[in-house]
């Protein structure tokens, strides 16, 4: 008798097929190849949104035979991480690791320490920085408040404070508040704020090129840093009392170097925005966390990376400058990495 190739049951066939279809849509005519603003670096943009809310429900109203219902989310800050803590979401994948660190420590915008764990931290090196044009004469963050300088700022979409659903704006706000001012203060002093949806948006690079802005408050510094530095901008160090306040708020620091950002004249300290953690509840069953890691391994060639290198599972469970970890590994994930030889310590 010929060997029969097993296949998924009909319901799973449709569910799995929809997931494959959704992923493939980013490789269709709905997407287009562009370049990052002000650079020749290719980047794919799509008419499809980047937000996702996904539920894998059980096939029966009452789960049988150990069936699981899993739900997934991407990005966000307070709401999504709170939903994982409240077991309304099974997993959320966010940028950056700082969001997980704030939640695990119980720092604002969270009400207290949340029972969260990481199953993986995907590599991404980044920083949130405050950069100003040399023509402003500004060399420190405190000078902006002291001189009440009417800066023309470009930053991200400026949702209303306290910015607790936007990791970028929450970090920016933490830095400038630690220095004693806000975006509203800048506007009150006669300045202005340009909001762009992403760090490399062409509206920003055009404004830099035309001299229409003199300050940049954002992350994604690898996408715009060199371009801005070559046109007279400098990155202000987060140091002294400002640094202490930012770290007390739950953030870690990172050193930017000329090796990372061409055009930088000397190392400068700023706020770490590295790492993309996949986050689950501390109480998730070990076998489910283990299986999630198995799935990452099975699809490692298909999962995009931010560091332009093939996905390395050993890096996902190892703390380094691209993969800081704001909460411990889930025990099920740790067992997977040890058994497969990815985690040796």
Please state what every model-predicted region is:
Residues 5-62, 67-71, 126-204, 304, ...:
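Bilobed "Venus flytrap"/periplasmic-binding protein-like clamshell domains
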Residues 49, 89, 149, 173, ...:
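Sec-exported extracytoplasmic/periplasmic mature domains
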Residues 57-111, 202-207, 219-230:
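Pocket-flanking alpha-helical
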Residues 84, 130, 144, 208, ...:
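Residue-level signal for nonpolar/aromatic packing positions in well-ordered secondary structure
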Residues 86, 114, 125-127, 148, ...:
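Extracytoplasmic
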Residues 96-98, 106-107, 136, 181-279, ...:
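Pocket-lining segment of extracytoplasmic ligand-binding domains
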Residues 111-128, 261-270:
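A structural signal for short loop-to-beta-strand junctions that line the ligand-binding cleft
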Residues 263, 267-345:
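Segments of small-molecule ligand-sensing domains
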């Amino acid at each position: 008798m010929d060997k029969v190739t097993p296949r998924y049951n009909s319901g799973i066939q449709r569910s799995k097929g929809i997931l494959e279809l959704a992923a493939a849509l980013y490789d269709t005519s709905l997407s287009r190849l562009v370049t990052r603003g002000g650079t020749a670096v290719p980047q794919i943009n799509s008419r499809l949104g980047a937000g996702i809310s996904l539920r894998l429900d059980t096939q029966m109203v009452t789960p049988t035979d150990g069936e699981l219902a899993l739900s997934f989310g991407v990005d966000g800050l307070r709401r999504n991480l709170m939903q994982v803590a409240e077991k309304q979401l099974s997993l959320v994948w966010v940028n950056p690791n700082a969001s997980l660190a704030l939640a695990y420590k119980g720092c604002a915008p969270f009400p207290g320490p949340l029972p969260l764990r990481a199953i993986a931290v995907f590599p991404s090196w980044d920083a949130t920085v405050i950069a100003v044009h040399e023509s402003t004469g500004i060399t420190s963050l405190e000078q902006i408040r002291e001189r009440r300088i009417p800066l023309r700022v470009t930053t991200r979409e400026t949702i209303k404070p306290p910015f607790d659903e936007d990791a970028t704006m929450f970090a920016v706000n933490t830095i400038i508040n630690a220095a004693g001012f806000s975006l509203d203060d800048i506007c009150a002093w006669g300045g202005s704020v340009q909001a762009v949806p992403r760090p490399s948006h062409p509206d920003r690079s055009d404004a830099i090129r035309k001299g229409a802005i003199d300050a940049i408050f954002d992350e994604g510094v690898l996408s715009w840093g060199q371009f801005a530095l070559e046109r007279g901008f400098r990155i202000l160090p987060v140091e002294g009392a400002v640094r202490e306040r930012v770290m007390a708020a739950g953030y870690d620091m990172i050193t930017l170097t000329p090796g990372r950002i061409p055009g930088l004249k000397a190392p400068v300290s700023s706020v770490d925005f590295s790492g993309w953690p996949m986050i689950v509840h501390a109480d998730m069953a070990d076998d489910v966390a283990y299986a999630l890691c198995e799935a990452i391994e099975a699809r490692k060639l298909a999962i995009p990376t931010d560091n332009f290198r093939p996905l390395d599972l050993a890096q996902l469970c190892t703390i380094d400058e691209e993969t800081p970890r704001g909460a411990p590994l889930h025990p099920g994930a740790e067992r997977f990495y040890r058994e497969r030889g990815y985690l040796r310590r």
